[in-house]
């Protein structure tokens, strides 16, 4: 409730309009029975046509007023709930942009998607009901009780007796739905995760002819979700039929016990009709309140899941007031860096790493799988923070930089190229929105992407499917490199970014890259020796430690690990074509 209110209170004008229309709704709904009683007692029973017409026109006017009030209420609630969920999702997404890789790993991407969509929608539904009935219900209930007591105090006990039966139903449903709601959202997380993995890995599934197996697994996951949903629907479905039966029993009891007052004239027929209407509205208010109570457990679960996102401690401090500019550009130094992934401090993946890189230099990293190459370069843009030691960029500790300013200095090209839905031009301008067409042309030419771009009718306006799925792996990789070239950073980081390219394209691309990286620091993580032979310095990693450094020729003579890697590739084109 407090989480929802923190957003709704930002719009006092809409809340005031909502309150006004809710009060109008209550006045109309409780005014109609009173007018109906007057029509019966003053118009129908004495057969006074003039009074009947008078009260008829009054009723017609109030009904019109009620229609206007209902329209205003729906409009105000619609504005409040849609604006609330918009702001809520914007805040959640902004918070996610502050997350480091560690926070994403803690919660899981599929769960985050579920929370941004399904959980936010649950809160929107509850806010809709609360704004419509949260004000109407107490006003209606209090007003109905007062009218019941003033109309026929002797029959009021019947309504009072009905309330505990309703309360028991509400309590039972509320207690039972909370754990089921918690399980429901977790099950939905698993279902979304399974669907996401399978849709992403569709080609692998088909390649191994595992469609039937995956269908069975999905059906099993879906069955768990459906079973839990059925349990929830059965519980919440109890409320309305039980309430209806209790209300019917109450009306029958009122009519039965009203026979004597009607017979002795102490109660008029019109007043009896009005009393039944007031009693109906009193219990209907309780029904609305019950619906809010049955919705609340699931809303509380969704609210907690969203607050987890907002309250998650950020392991990477963005340092908004940090350094934004430096006199030099591209100087990089690792000073005795040790790194362990969060929660795994006993098992560091990097030990005592120290090296320097200057603008114009190319530093390469090579080693066996799991030696820490990618972990090392991910520390520079602070995807993770070092455990011990420090990393300096232009003489400043990366933790002392404004995080955005630090990342502006870096062009990071991951092994798995990620492109966004949109045009090729939009993707290339991702790091520099005002890049000219000439800059795009140059970057495409350098990255060896120009040929396949030119082969498409719309060239840079070619639309890319989700994740660039309408391109080959090599084409996506070249566009990823071109995107970094357009950005023109101080430090280029190629995290095994040439692996999807053939050897000839790899060699040509690296040769052309020198045209734009002459004043920048270039770091290359690679598996191919041929990719890094021309580097100014090659650093050999083994089990997170530096076990060798030097040029290709120096390492071939002095470092056994490097020599083994190189010799294993001697028969491949990686060395012969260089």
For each feature predicted by the language model, list its residue ranges.
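Membrane-integrated ABC transporters
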Residues: 1-29, 36, 44-58, 73-77, ...
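An intracellular "coupling" helix at the cytosolic face of ABC transporter transmembrane type-1 domains
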Residues: 9-12, 77, 98-102, 118-131, ...
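Transmembrane helices of ABC transporter permease
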Residues: 10, 14-27, 38, 129-184, ...
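Helix-loop-helix
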Residues: 48-51, 143, 147-161, 231-305, ...
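Helix-loop junctions and hydrophobic alpha-helical segments within the transmembrane domains
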Residues: 92, 96, 205, 306, ...
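Pre-NBD coupling/linker segments of ABC/ABC-like ATPases
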Residues: 314-327
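ABC-type nucleotide-binding domain
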Residues: 326-578
């Amino acid at each position: 409730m407090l989480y929802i209110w923190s957003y709704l209170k930002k719009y006092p004008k809409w809340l005031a309009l909502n309150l006004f229309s809710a009060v109008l709704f209550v006045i109309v709904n409780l005014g109609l029975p009173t007018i109906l009683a007057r029509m019966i007692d003053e118009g129908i029973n004495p057969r006074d046509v003039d009074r009947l017409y008078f009260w008829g026109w009054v009723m017609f006017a109030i009904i019109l007023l009620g229609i206007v009030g209902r329209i205003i209420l729906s409009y105000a609630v619609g504005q409040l709930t849609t604006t609330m969920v918009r702001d809520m999702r914007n805040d959640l997404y902004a918070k996610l942009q502050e997350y480091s890789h560690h926070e994403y790993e803690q919660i899981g991407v599929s769960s985050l998607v579920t929370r941004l969509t399904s959980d936010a929608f649950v809160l929107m539904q509850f806010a809709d009901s609360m704004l419509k009935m949260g004000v109407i219900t107490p006003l209606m209930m209090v007003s109905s009780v007062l009218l019941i007591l003033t109309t026929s105090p002797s029959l009021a006990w019947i309504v009072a007796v009905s309330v505990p039966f309703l309360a028991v139903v509400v309590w039972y449903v509320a207690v039972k739905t909370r754990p089921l709601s918690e399980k429901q959202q977790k099950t939905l997380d698993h279902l979304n995760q399974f669907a996401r993995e399978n849709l992403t890995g569709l080609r692998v599934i088909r390649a191994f002819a595992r469609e039937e197996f995956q269908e069975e697994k999905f059906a099993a996951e879906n069955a768990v979700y459906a079973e839990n949903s059925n349990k929830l629907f059965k519980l919440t479905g109890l409320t309305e039929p039980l309430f209806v039966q209790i209300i019917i029993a109450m009306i029958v009891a009122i009519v039965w016990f009203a026979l004597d007052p009607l017979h002795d004239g102490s109660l008029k027929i019109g007043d009896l009709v009005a009393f039944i209407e007031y009693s109906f509205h009193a219990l209907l208010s309780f029904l609305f309140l019950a619906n809010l109570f049955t919705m609340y457990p699931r809303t509380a679960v969704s609210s907690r899941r969203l607050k987890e996102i907002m309250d998650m401690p950020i392991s990477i401090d963005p340092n908004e007031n940090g350094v934004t500019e430096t006199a030099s550009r591209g100087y990089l130094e690792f000073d005795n860096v040790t790194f362990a992934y969060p929660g795994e401090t006993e098992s560091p993946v990097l030990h005592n790493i120290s090296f320097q890189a200057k603008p114009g230099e190319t530093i390469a990293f090579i080693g066996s799988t799991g030696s820490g190459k990618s972990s090392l370069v991910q520390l520079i843009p602070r995807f993770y923070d070092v455990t011990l030691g420090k990393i300096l960029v232009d003489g400043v500790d990366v933790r002392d930089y404004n995080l955005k300013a630090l990342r502006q200095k870096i062009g990071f090209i991951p092994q798995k190229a990620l492109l966004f839905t949109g045009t090729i031009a939009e993707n290339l301008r991702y790091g520099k929105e005002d890049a000219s067409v000439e800059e795009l042309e140059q970057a495409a030419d350098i990255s060896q992407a120009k040929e396949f771009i030119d082969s498409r009718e719309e060239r840079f306006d070619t639309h890319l499917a989700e994740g660039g799925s309408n391109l080959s792996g090599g084409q996506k990789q070249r566009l990823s490199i071109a995107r970094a070239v357009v950005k023109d950073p101080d430090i280029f980081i190629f995290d095994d970014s040439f692996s999807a390219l053939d050897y000839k394209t790899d060699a040509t691309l690296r040769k052309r890259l020198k045209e734009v990286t002459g004043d920048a620091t270039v770091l290359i993580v690679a598996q191919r020796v041929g990719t890094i032979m021309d580097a100014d310095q090659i650093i050999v990693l083994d089990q997170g430690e530096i076990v060798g450094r030097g040029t290709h020729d120096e390492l071939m003579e002095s470092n056994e690990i490097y020599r083994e890697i190189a010799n294993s590739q001697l028969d491949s084109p990686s060395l012969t074509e260089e």
